[in-house]
Amino acid sequence: MLAAWNVGAILYLVLTIEMCARSTVDKIRRRGRVQSESNVMTIVLVVSAVIAAQTAIVMELAMVKDLHGTIKAAHIALTVLTIVTAWAFMHSMFALHYAHDFYDSLAHHRPLGLQFVGTPDPEYGDFFYCAFIIGTSGQTADVTFINKPMRRLGMVHSVLAFAFNTILLAMMINIAASLF
């Protein structure tokens, strides 16, 4: 199950990186108009995927305790890879959501949800910066949430990141304990 998750997550991340690298601000604007309609669905997908990955990780860790040698090392490596891919998947999904919502709001003349200092036309990298800063520190550094719906989304992202990071810490302690 973890191998399938990792193949899917890595494929998603590679395709996302490729898409972002090739995108201009105009392409992001077009995608924003098409993809921002699924706000709730994005959150449901992210939460479901991360819960499924974490459940699989817990099940894997329970099994690892009875293994030895290279098989144990391989299972631990797979578990660590799953933790990394689940973490990156979650924040990448939020980054894309932030980008598409930003440009959808711009297209429909609604107040923008985010403000990037000195960057009137943010690119995907700016939104990934925002999402991964929330993912690592629970704050937004120099990106400002400027409307209520986006602040709520940022809060959900921050709470999910906190929960994920707390569970991640517990899992890493468990992995370290299973090594001895």
In which residue ranges do the predicted regions lie?
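Pore domain of cation channels
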Residues: 126, 130-133, 143-180
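Loop-to-helix transition at the N-terminal end of transmembrane alpha-helices
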Residues: 1-14, 18
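Membrane-proximal soluble regions of multi-pass membrane proteins
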Residues: 100-147
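Membrane-helix interface/capping segments
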Residues: 17-35, 58-68
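Alpha-helical transmembrane segments and their membrane-interface junctions
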Residues: 49-70, 132-148
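Juxtamembrane helix-capping/reentrant segments at transmembrane boundaries
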Residues: 28-48
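Transmembrane alpha-helix/helix-exit interface in multi-pass inner-membrane proteins
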Residues: 84-106
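Interfacial segments of alpha-helical transmembrane regions
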Residues: 70-88
